[in-house]
Amino acid sequence: MIIQLIRYFKHAIIFNPSSAIRVAVLLAAMLAYGTTGFLYFELSENPDLSWTDGLWYTLVTMTTVGYGDFFPKTSAGRFLVGWPVMFFGIGLLGYALSMIAAALVTEKSKELKGMMTFSLKDHLVIFNFPGVTMIERVIEELRLDSCFGRERQVVLIDDDLAELPAELQKLHVHFVKGNPTRDETLKRASIDEATHAVILSKKPGDPASDNLNISITLAIEGRSRKVNTVVECMDPATEELLRKAGCDRIVCTSRFGANFMSQELLNPGVQEVLDDLLSSRKGQQFYFVPFQGSPAPFSAVADACRGRGHLALGVSRADGVRINPQQDFQVSEGERVITVGPSRLAVLSV
């Protein structure tokens, strides 16, 4: 082990050093030259000088600050130390700063092009890029809800996007470029530590996008079943396959689109109502509030909701949803009350 370390040191440091190591060595040599040279020539003129003073003079000269608290008084100190430190030191320092700036630019470019690996926790991962507007709306709606929070990190995975758009950069979205069905790509997005995953259709309106979403769902569920996955699909026939793949929730946009069209025809204005209820940006929203405590009739639960500024619409249970149930319908602990209100309630009890 020691022999291997020595060989690595000889190869990487002595025989084939990187540019950064070369610059660091040259800077250290210049600091040593300036410090020792300043003391060697100036100590006779000023016996109170110390090594710290010599180092300070060298640093001040190399950075062109020039405080003037220390300066060479002898001709040898000026021409053999001062001039070399000024010319060569400034050049070396400028080159070192340019290397640092180039490294920062390269790092930022890699991040925007999706070449980075992220170490995150309790974040959201969005799969596929159907367009800036869709991604923006999903993130903004989620961040407006206290359950999600404004500070939660978001990672976007897509294999075709060349660079993260400026609009998503403003939302502090991280980008991972790669095949979303591959383990290597999922690892780079820290999928094992994520709490939520939203799988969007890559080409809205194209049922063929469902095949990719099924593969992504299988890849996620094969790694971590604790991730809460919501999948968009185009073809209603795909829903059963997605359930078998293990996703938690499915949104069939083609089916909802047909429903919205027919309802708008039968009940003009329903679109405005749903837009208000489904958006966190304005008005009232739907909420699923956990019920806590002893079983109670729906009438008592509705009264408790009204007392907190909410309207009770129904109950979500393991066997389905009950909308506008009978007044004596029993609501048990663990079930969720469907309400409409101005903000999310943590729990509901009677």
Describe the residue ranges of each PLM region.
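The feature identifies polytopic integral membrane transport proteins across all domains of life
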Residues: 50-57
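Cytosolic regulatory regions of ion transport systems
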Residues: 1-34, 39-42, 46-48, 61-63, ...
